[in-house]
Amino acid sequence: MTRDIEQFRAHVRQWCAEHVPPDWRAAQTGVSDDEYVRFQKSWFAELHTSGFAVPHWPAEWGGGMSVAEQIVLYSELAAHDAPRLVLAFVGIHHAASTLLAAGTEEQRRRHLPAILDGEIWVQGFSEPEAGSDLAALRTTARRDGADFVVNGQKVWASGGLHADWCLLLARTDPDAKKRHGISYLLMDMNSPGIEVRPIKQATGESHFCEVFLNDVRVPAANLVGPENKGWQVAQETLGAERGMTMLELAERLGNAGFRWLVAECARAGVLAESLVADRLAQFEIEITGLRGLCRDLVEGRSDGPADASVVKLFYSELLQRLTDFGAQISGLAGHTVLAKPISSGWESGAWVLDFIGSWEWTIPGGASEIQRTIIGERGLGLPREPAGA
């Protein structure tokens, strides 16, 4: 590792010591939606002012960090228990990667600066009958002059209650094969005809929403990529969930998540018990392995056709086991915690709520069963599952 990287690490550590709110977890427990949005936007602005909000973007748009610098940044933010950018996530990762890869210059100039100013995005992909089989989506976009007229329903839209814009997949050619008649649109969430309904989760939160679209007019200028080629464009969006974003999550799990678990075992007075010590050691080994897989992926040492699926499966299953163990250790007391810091992700130390929430990670972005199929077919060369299996 070079001296420059070590200097950068020292700079990030100093910044974290000065800027990460020391009491943010307590302050973010049980807050209202408005308070949550204000805090998320304020923290994003703090990171942006210091050049830490979008390190993966090109330099001309406010990023330009090397892979090594990004690894250091995410590692130090996790080590200092910084809040997660939950509401900004889709914008800075999914929307940005799509616009940079397939958007027009006008679309980039309109939306990338707005994202840096706090514009919130939601992903409008999944539908009630099109989750794992996303290409089966039924939402339609009919061309009408200079607009597309959109009708349909989206579900599991993360952050939809607060979103300004939506990355929308809709069927523009009903006669084409499933993946060949889909277009990719940028939809203003303030457009007439949009209804957003929160989905109440078992944790008590409403992070996900249903979005109903009734004759919503989307300007044709908001089409990303060629008409009917949205499936190919969407691969850029889905690809943004891998690599560096998974490294950030792995670092957070290895810092805040594991630290909270050790502290829980200490509070329960079981830290010295051999069974508990063995489980903690196993978790630490797995977290170390996950970090290594993520770093191999982002540094280009791993480029197999199923490597991203391996990382996603490994992380989500490990998160679920770790939070399950935390819930067991916390006992009855863990079931009485009814609120958690909502800017923390799924490693808050509210173990029962974290465990319930962890199940979401084994479904979105490709369920664990889908990831295993990809690993088997693309990674190991096993026979493909028969159609309809």
Q: What spans do the regions from the language model cover?
A:
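A short, Trp-centered hydrophobic/proline-enriched beta-strand micro-motif
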Residues: 117-125, 169
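Glycine-rich phosphate/cofactor-binding loops in nucleotide/flavin-utilizing enzymes
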Residues: 68, 72-73, 94, 231-241, ...
